[in-house]
Amino acid sequence: MEFLMSKHEADAPHLLIVEARFYDDLADALLDGAKAALDEAGATYDVVTVPGALEIPATISFALDGADNGGTEYDGFVALGTVIRGETYHFDIVSNESCRALTDLSVEESIAIGNGILTVENEEQAWVHARREDKDKGGFAARAALTMIGLRKKFGA
């Protein structure tokens, strides 16, 4: 996929990576991909860790409120985590609600968010999506956030 952002449109953007570390090894792989993509783009970033995917949208909201009160302002956000289907309905709730909340934040607050929360059937699928040499969803989410930063600037939002 080609991303619609040139270096000029997003000159040194500063992003917040919010990572859920429910599965530490998978979180490391996703974070590695996101950092590599942001480094390659010349972006700067902070990283904050939360317990699970449902806590990611709230953390982004906290960061937005903090910026309104003199804290760090971020140009965009990268959400990283893994939700693996289990034997209960919990997978559906976490998958649907984390995605819905990120979409709501993005639209209602006009912010750039790259969604790198994996929702998979098993650990094998998670690894295929997390590893940089495979699908590199961490890198994809970071590049998506950069693209959205560029589009927001292009439209003057």
From Swiss-Prot:
Catalysis performed (reactions): (2S)-2-hydroxy-3-oxobutyl phosphate + 5-amino-6-(D-ribitylamino)uracil = 6,7-dimethyl-8-(1-D-ribityl)lumazine + phosphate + 2 H2O + H(+)
Family (UniProt): Belongs to the DMRL synthase family.
NCBIfam families: lumazine-synth (TIGR00114), PRK00061.2-2 (NF000814)
Keyword RNA-binding among record annotations: no
Enzyme class per UniProt: transferase
Pathway(s) of this molecule: Cofactor biosynthesis; riboflavin biosynthesis; riboflavin from 2-hydroxy-3-oxobutyl phosphate and 5-amino-6-(D-ribitylamino)uracil: step 1/2
Keywords: Riboflavin biosynthesis, Transferase
Entry keyword annotation includes Transferase: yes
Organism the protein comes from: Brucella abortus (strain 2308)
Binding positions ((2S)-2-hydroxy-3-oxobutyl phosphate): E87, T88, H129
Protein name as annotated: 6,7-dimethyl-8-ribityllumazine synthase 1
